[in-house]
């Protein structure tokens, strides 16, 4: 039974707010500056305590949507030190969100130290892809020794959409799922399993996104480094944080603002 649902949005940019729906007739909205994800989690907890629950003792577990599980995880897991170590290792491949996921775990550990925490990885759903879908056409050693491959992301979203669509249509065959937001991806799903997806080794690949470039000629970063005297870290920051809609519009990441 769903007691409440909601979101914290536009974190780190103007117009941030926290909203929560207790039922269809009641929606609470709080406009508040959310400078980072830790502040957002605190506001969510405050809103829950002011509404559907009266004490933190009512919270049995907290689920975390994690970004990258590498090849370690193909399902949700209870968080322990081993899981955290592997998540930190895989999280290094997520320049935009890697640390943010861990901030959430740290915040809950501090605020609710006795509550069980569970990690659900965005990449887990795509572990069903076959080699012809996840291998890149580069020397095979790059995968076998360094695990460079297509991982895919937004798996929790694509999995949920596929399951709900199958229920609604009474059909579990082939679907194309589109996740469209600040980050965006498309996934081909067959019989409830991911068979191909637009994101790749990192969430930078695929479609144009809020601040990410999406697919570009792979020589472009090398050309920029050679001709503009930029380091690899500087080019990475540009492609992850200064490109996409932000780069094309010189400053806007939200399509609602661009429209």
Regions found by a protein language model. Give the residues of each.
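Short glycine-rich, Thr/Ser-proximal phosphate-binding strand/loop in the N-terminal lobe
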Residues: 1-34, 200
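Non-transmembrane, aqueous-exposed alpha-helical and coiled segments at domain scale
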Residues: 56, 112-114, 185
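Short beta-strand segments
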Residues: 63-65, 118-121, 176-183
